[in-house]
Amino acid sequence: MDLPGPRWKKGKDGKDFASLAAANPMSAIVSELKASFISSKPVAILSGPGGSAVLGVGPEQAVILNRAAFGHAIENATAQKHWFQLSPEEVFYLCHALNCIRVDSLDNKQMSEIELWDYFRSGSESFPEMYKAYAHLRLKNWVVRSGLQYGADFVAYRHHPALVHSEFAVVVVPEGAEFGNRCGRLEVWSDLLCALRASGSVAKTLLVLTISSSSKCELSSPDCLEQLVVHERTITRWILQQCREQRCEPSRDEVNREELIIEKESVVFNHWGVILGFTVLSGLLVYRLKFRQ
């Protein structure tokens, strides 16, 4: 069963934004953001026990951050400083993977990557596998946002959410003893059906990311990320009525077979036409000869 393609949004002229996205690939935008942020190293301040952080940037950096689809802009009265609220996965990705921001604690002390990892793990036990899934998609130039409103962990966009609708509802499934009782998601048939129906009702394909370890590792350090492996699986529902009523395009062999049948029928029809015409002419000739006699 073929997966549905991207659903591009349309501008005022009625044309979709596919060409605009192709001219501005997300990989180039993220590279531009990294180059801009490395020189100034903007500071993200942890905002509370939930794990989110607030990042302050200048006007030009705010434009790049918005184009790269990191965080959500916070409205404020000052035009010189722009603030963005970042999720734990976004904070650690900008700090660890891109190495382009600095993170301070609530008491304004700079945090190391290990301290930041421990902080996010204390807020959410599932942070290691969630971050691994987030980074896996981001490194493939997908835009990743929270999928809680769709009954998933994340949703994945082909480009900026202003240009295209999200294609995938992402569910993260950890496997292995190191993940403890967090294993076993979607193993019950009813859970899988619920996830499929929830994603299908909002025109998204269910993408299951299974996180496992290539060797025994400790999740207490970000070094474990190199040993975690991601397996991608898309799951779709086969709807009998829909498949029966949909008209499928015939294959090339079927088209050639139909053309051959039509040619044969045409030859047979022409053959019988010749015989019928000859019979009629013969009858007329015999009739005229009898009439003259």
Swiss-Prot record:
Keyword terms: Lyase, Membrane, mRNA processing, Nucleus, Transmembrane, Transmembrane helix, tRNA processing
Top-level taxon: Eukaryota
Primary subcellular site in the record, as a coarse category: nucleus
Active site (catalytic residues): 157, 165, 204
EC number: 4.6.1.16
Molecular function, one GO term: lyase activity
PANTHER family in the record: TRNA-SPLICING ENDONUCLEASE SUBUNIT SEN2
The protein's name: Probable tRNA-splicing endonuclease subunit Sen2
